UniProtKB/Swiss-Prot annotation:
Disruption phenotype: Larvae lethal. Larvae die around the first molt at the first or second instar stage. Glycans are attached at N133, N269, N458, N549, N612, N652, N787, N808, N981, N1152, N1251. Its main location: membrane. There are 3 carboxypeptidase-like domains. Only the first two domains seem to have catalytic activity. However, in svr proteins there are two alternative carboxypeptidase-like 1 domains (CP-1), a catalytically inactive 1A form (in isoforms 3, 4 and 6) and an active 1B form (in isoforms 1, 5, and 7). All 3 carboxypeptidase-like domains (active CP-1, CP-2 and CP-3) appear to necessary for maintaining full viability. The keyword Metal-binding applies. Zn(2+) 1 binds at H101, E104, H217. It comes from Drosophila melanogaster (Fruit fly). One of its GO terms (molecular function) is structural constituent of cuticle. Zn(2+) 2 binds at H517, E520, H626. This is Carboxypeptidase D. The active site is at E305, E730.
Amino acid sequence: MPTLGLLFASIGIAVLAMGVPHCRGYTIKEDESFLQQPHYASQEQLEDLFAGLEKAYPNQAKVHFLGRSLEGRNLLALQISRNTRSRNLLTPPVKYIANMHGDETVGRQLLVYMAQYLLGNHERISDLGQLVNSTDIYLVPTMNPDGYALSQEGNCESLPNYVGRGNAANIDLNRDFPDRLEQSHVHQLRAQSRQPETAALVNWIVSKPFVLSANFHGGAVVASYPYDNSLAHNECCEESLTPDDRVFKQLAHTYSDNHPIMRKGNNCNDSFSGGITNGAHWYELSGGMQDFNYAFSNCFELTIELSCCKYPAASTLPQEWQRNKASLLQLLRQAHIGIKGLVTDASGFPIADANVYVAGLEEKPMRTSKRGEYWRLLTPGLYSVHASAFGYQTSAPQQVRVTNDNQEALRLDFKLAPVETNFDGNFRKVKVERSEPPQKLKKQFNGFLTPTKYEHHNFTAMESYLRAISSSYPSLTRLYSIGKSVQGRDLWVLEIFATPGSHVPGVPEFKYVANMHGNEVVGKELLLILTKYMLERYGNDDRITKLVNGTRMHFLYSMNPDGYEISIEGDRTGGVGRANAHGIDLNRNFPDQYGTDRFNKVTEPEVAAVMNWTLSLPFVLSANLHGGSLVANYPFDDNENDFNDPFMRLRNSSINGRKPNPTEDNALFKHLAGIYSNAHPTMYLGQPCELFQNEFFPDGITNGAQWYSVTGGMQDWNYVRAGCLELTIEMGCDKFPKAAELSRYWEDHREPLLQFIEQVHCGIHGFVHSTIGTPIAGAVVRLDGANHSTYSQVFGDYWKLALPGRHNLTVLGDNYAPLRMEVEVPDVHPFEMRMDITLMPDDPQHWASANDFRIIENVVNTRYHTNPQVRARLAELENQNGQIASFGYADSEFGTIFNYLKMTSDIGEPEEHKYKLLVVSSLYDTTAPLGREILLNLIRHLVEGFKLQDTSVVELLKRSVIYFLPQTSKFQNVFDMYNSNTSICDPVLGDELAERILGPETDQAKDVFLQFLRSERFDLMLTFGAGNSDLNYPKGDSVLVKFAHRMQRTEFNYSPLQCPPSATRQLHRETTERLTNMMYRIYNLPVYTLGISCCRMPHQKKIASVWRKNIDKIKNFLALVKTGVSGLVQNDKGQPLREAYVRLLEHDRIINVTKNVARFQLMLPHGLYGLEVTAPNYESQMIKVDVEDGRVTELGIIRMHPFTLIRGVVLELPNNDNRATTSIAGVVLDESNHPVRNAKVSVVGQTQLRNFTGSMGQYRISAVPLGTITLKVEAPRHLEATRQMHLIQGGLATENVVFHLKVNEHVFGLPRFLFILCASVLIIVGVIVCVLCAQFWFYRRHRGDKPYYNFSLLPQRGKEQFGLEDDDGGDDGETELFRSPIKRELSQRAHLVNNQTNYSFIIQAA
C-alpha cells in the first residue's frame, strides 16, 4: 500500500506538472512568432491587424473607434477581455496608450506585440488566461498617427522644429489636456482650441471607469508618476505629490523592478533612484495626460519612458519586447490591489456617482460607475472607508485590512439609506419678463431699448452719464480714470466686458480714443451712444453678446477735456479748443521715431496718462477718432525728414506728390482702413470736404505721411512702441457739428465702429508655454520676417493680427530655442486660428555653436573680471593674435588711464582707407563692469571669427580699425558694492565719467579721453548703458536714424525691457542725451548708446543672457562699415587737396578728407544721395551716387578746378531761355570750409535783391535780371567778396555758387598783429603813467598832512639800549650825544639811505 500510494502520488505530481508552464523539467512554449521580421506597422497595417484579431477572437477582442486625428486618421483601441460584448461586474478596466508623441515609437509597437501576445497565449498559459479573464484591457497603440507619419526611423532625437513630436498642427498633445491648476476661464478658452486627438481621449477616459493606465513615451528609461506640475511652477527638482503617493510609487516600482535596465536608474546619462521619479521633480509640465487621469477621473496613470532613442531601428524591437514584457504584465495585475465593491440603495439598485472615501485620503474620493462599481487602489494597511451620495445618508465607516495577497482586490460593499425630506411652505416659480419684447423696443427706439437723446455733453454731463450707465450695468462695465488733464479733469475710461476688472488670458484688448483735439467732438458723442447701444442689446442681440463676451473693450471718451470746454458748437474747421490747456496739440506730443522738436520735447499730462495706460494692457487694436475730414488714415504719419521740413506738416488741400511712408504691415493696415471705410455709406467714395476741394482719397483711405505729415502722432507711437495697431478715423468734415446732426453721424458710423472692433479677432492667437506648461511672458511673435513684433503676456497669451493666407510664424522666448512654422489663416469667417506654441528650453552650447563660433566662455560660468584679469586677457589676445590685435597699456598717458585693444587686419599698415570705430564699455563707472564683459565677449567673437576666416569678420577688419576701451578706473569700488550685495542691481557713485566729461572742472581722465577723440577722429562710437533696452543716438539726421533702425533690426527681436523707473536711471538717461549731443556737435562723432540691461550690474550669471540678447545689435553696428561711399579729391594737376571736405546734401555733417592722400569715406545706408565736394579756392562739385546695400561705392578720383574770381574775368553760364529773370543759389564758407551764417549776399546796384545765409551758409536770391551782374557777400569779421557773372538764360536757377570768405585781420586799418602790438605798448605806457601819478599824489598828500615831519641826527646809544653787539655801539662806547626831538611813543621806522652820502635818515610815522 505505501508503494502504491507513492506511485499514485508520483503520477499526480506529473499531471500537475503538465499544467504548469515553468516547472522544473517542463516548459510551455509561448507563441511569439510576431517577433519575426520586426518592423513598425503603418497606420493601414495597424488597422488591418486589429480587424484580423477581432475576427480571429470574436469574444475576446473588439476594436473601438475613439475619433479621428487632425488629418483624418482613425484613433483605435483594441479591447481584450473575457467577454468584450458585456463586461463582467467589478472587472477593472485598464488601458495602455502609446505614441502620444509621434516620434516616440517603441511603445506603439510594444502594444501591437502585447495584443498579439495576450490573444495568442491566454488559452495556453493559465496565468495569462487568468489575467485576461479578470481584467478589461484596452490597448491604444497610437494616439498621434499624424505625427507618426511625419517621423523618421533611426532618429533618436526629434526632427528640427520638433516635427513629428506634435500632431499635424505641431501641438504637443501631452500639454493639451485640461489641467487641474487651470482657472475656469482658461479651461474654457483652451477647450475651444483643443486638438481632436486630445478631445477624443478626454471623452473616452471620462466615459469609462478606468482604474489603471500607462502612457508610453521615449527618450529616457524611467517610470514617472503624478503630479507633473505644482502651484509654484518650478522648472524642476521639486516634488509635487498626490495623496496616493504610496500607491503610485508601488505602481512605478512594479514596472521598474521588472525591467532589467530601468531598475538601475542610470541609463541615458540620467540618474533616477530605483528607476522611478515624480514628474514635477524631473521637469514640470501642465496639460499632461497622467495628471488629467488622476484629477478628473478615477484612473491612476503612469508615464513610462521606454528607451533612450525615440525612434530606434526596427531590428531592436524584439529586444525591447523582452525587456518590457514582464513589466507590462505585472503592471496589469496591479489593477487588482486595494478594495473594490458596489454602492447600492436599500433596494439593491446601484447608485451612480457616489463617493467612496478612505480616511486620510479624503482629497481623492473614488466615484462609482453607472453600475455602482468602485475600485480603490491601496497599499497594504488598515483603513477606514465610508461612502456617500447626494440624496442618501452617509454610510458608517468600515474598518478593513488590505494585504494585497489575493489575486483580486478585497471586496467591500455599501448600502445607503435615502435622506428624509420634509419641505414646508408653498413654493412657486417666478418668471420675470420685460414689459415689452426686446424686438418691439428695438424697432421703436431705432435699435435701442430705451429712448436716446442726441446731444452734446460737456465734462460734467459726460461724467454723470458714465456714472449712471456704469451703475446700471455693474456686471458688464468698469469706470476708471487713467489720469488727469492740465486743469485737473479726469480722463475717464469705461471698460465693457462680460467679466470686467482684469485681463483674461486669451481675450483680446481693444480701445477707442476720442476727443484728442478738444473741438473735434463727433467721436466722443458717438462713443457715448455706442456704449448705450451695446449694453442695452447685450443678451438679446447675438452679435453684440458675442462681442462683449469675447472682447475686452475700453473707451476713452475725451482725451482733451480742457480743450472741449472752450470749444464752440457749430465750429466747422476752427482751432479754438484744439490744443490742451498748455496750448499743445496732443497729436504732436508723443515720442516720435524720427526725432524730437518743441512740440514733443515736454510730455503733456494727458499724453503721459495715455501712454502709461496703453503700455499697461496688451492692446491689440485701436482707433483714434478725429474730425475735420472723412477718411480712414493709417501709419506712418510722417517721414524721416519731416522734422527738418516744416512745409511737409501743412495741410495744403492736395496730397499729390507727397511721399507715403508705409509700415511693414501696410497690407494689413489698408485692409483695416478699408473695413471701416467700406462699412460707411460715403467714406469709401473718397470725396473731398468743402474747404479742401483737392483732397481725394481713393477708397476713402490714406497713408498719413502721404496726406500731410504729423510728427509726434499717437497712431505711430502705438505701432512702434506699444505694438498696438491703430488707425486715425476722420469722422466728418465738421469738427463740432450741431447736436441735431448727431443722429445722422450715428447712423453713418454705427456699423463701421462695430465692424472695426470685430477685426481684433482676425489673425492668429493662442498661448506660448514651455514644455512643462509654464506660460512664457515676453515671447516674440513675428510674421513673415517682419521687424514689427507682438509679445506674449503674463499668462503666455498672444494676438497677432494677420490677413487670410499662409504665413511664416517665428516665435522666440528668452532662454528658449527659436521656433519657426508655417500657418494658414482661413479665408472664411471668422478669419482666425488658434495656435498654441510650445518652446523647448535652449541649450547655451548649441546657441554658441550657431551664433558665437562656439565660444563657451561667453555663455557658461560667466563672471565679472577684475582689472588685472582684464589686462591679462587683453595682453594674451595680443600675444596670440599679433597680426590683428594690439594692446595699449602704459604706452602713453591715455594708455595708462584707459587700457585699450586695437583691432584691424595687418596691424601697422596705413589706415587712411579704413573706417575708425570706437567701442567703450560704458561712460558710466557703475555700468562699466557689465559693459566690459560684453566688450570682452565681442573681442573674443571677432578673434575667433578671424581664426575661422569668417567672411563677415575678415571683411570688417579689412575695412575698419576698432578701438575697444574697457573702462577700469573705478571698477574696484563698484565691484566691492556687488560683492557685499550681489542683488544690488544699480550701484551708485557720486562722480560718473559721463558727468565729469560734461562738467567744467579739469579732470585727467576726462581730458585725455577728449584729446583721444580729437586726435583719432572716429567715424562712429558705440557704448553700453543700462536701465532700458533703448538705443540712444543724435536725433535729426536721417542717416543716423537709418543706422539706428538697421542696428535694431535683428532676426529675433526680444521683448523691450520693462525697467522700473528710478531717479538715477532718469539721471543717466538725461546725461546720456546731453553727452550724445555734445559729442556730435563738438567732435563730429555720432555716439550710439545701447541699453543692454535693466540693472547696471546684474548677477554675473545673467551676463550670458545679456550677451545673447544684444549680440545681433552689436554685430549690426559693426556691419555698418559694409555700406557707403569713398573717393579721392585732387586738383587738376593730380595733387591731393588736403583741405577739401565732403558734405551730404540736406545734412549738416561735414567730413574732412585725410591729411595724406585726401581720401574721404562715408558710411551710408543704401539709397540715392547727393554729395557736395568742396575745397578752398576750388569750385564745388555735386555728385549723385546710388549706394547699394553691403557694398562701398568707390567714386575714384574727383578732380577740382580753381575758382574764376572777379579779376577782369567774367564767368558765363550758357543758357537758351528768353525769360527776363533767373535765380542764384549757393553757399558761403570760410577758409576752413565752415559755413558762415547771417552773411549778406546782394546784387551790386540792385538794393532790393539781397538775402542772408542760413545756419549752413546756404542762400538763394530770386528775380535776378539777366545780363552781367556782380554778387557781393558781406559778413561780420570777414572780408567782403564779389563775383561777376553773366546770365543769359532765364527761368532755370543758377546753383552752387560758392563763396569762400577770408577772416578780416585788420583793425582800424592796421594789421591785427601791428594793432595788438601798438595797443599793448599804449596800454603799458598808460599804466606806468597812472602809477607814477598816483605815487606822486600820495607822497604830496602824506607830506602835507604831517607837521612833525623833520630830519634829525641818529641817536647814539650803547649796546644796552639797542641790544646790539659791541661793534654796533661804536668804538668809543658813547651812549648819546644829542636827544632827538622825535616823539618817543612812535615805534614804526623807515630807513632812508642816501647812496651818495654817508648820512642815514629815519622817517618815523605815526
